[in-house]
Amino acid sequence: MLTLTACSSGGSSTSSTTATPSEADVVAWMDKVCGAVDGTVKAMSDEPSIDMNDPSKLKTGLSDWLGTKVAAVDKSITDLKALENGPHPKSKELVTSAEDGMGQVRTLLADTRSKLDSSTDATQVVTAFTEMIGKAATLEKTGADVQKKFDETGLGAVAQKAPNCKGLQAAPSATPTS
């Protein structure tokens, strides 16, 4: 009788019922997070096709180009939202940081597009676009902040194993540094 009592604790278990995610699950999730961000990075890598000699085509060309960029950022944000409840305890924190960064990029692009669309001459068009380019450092800082969040959330090593994250880290700056 004593043996049976000793073998069965009879008490309630305090162990968590939540399964610990495998590293492979976290890497796969992180790859999706970086893939969502990479969609915007790739969209931002091309230059607008513009005709500097025709003010109406200049305005339309830049506005259309910005419209495709806003759409890419919107897709990234939507894709990120779907990843908020990932397998890592800090999933939501990391994804929210990425969403915030994408939101800043979207605001800059949408505000520039609005200025372009309301401009009445080529000088205003060029000024609005030049202002946006002048804020490119803000965009780069946004990317650096997301990279920093990888480390703060303990996901830096995982990010190095995710193919889409490697692509983000190796992405050269499209902004001239001179």
Where are these regions (language model features)?
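C-terminal motif of bacterial Sec signal peptides marking the signal peptidase cleavage site
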Residues: 3-6
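Long, low-complexity or tandemly repetitive, helically biased scaffold regions used
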Residues: 121-127, 173, 177
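Bacterial signal peptide processing site
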Residues: 8-11
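Short, solvent-exposed, charged loop/turn and helix-capping segments
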Residues: 75-99, 111-124
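Immediate post-signal-peptide N-terminus of mature secreted/exported proteins
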Residues: 14-68, 170-174
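Short, low-complexity, Pro/Ser/Thr/Gly-rich segments in the mature regions of secreted, periplasmic
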Residues: 160-178
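Generic structural signal for well-ordered, non-transmembrane alpha-helical segments
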Residues: 31-38, 42, 63-74, 96-110, ...
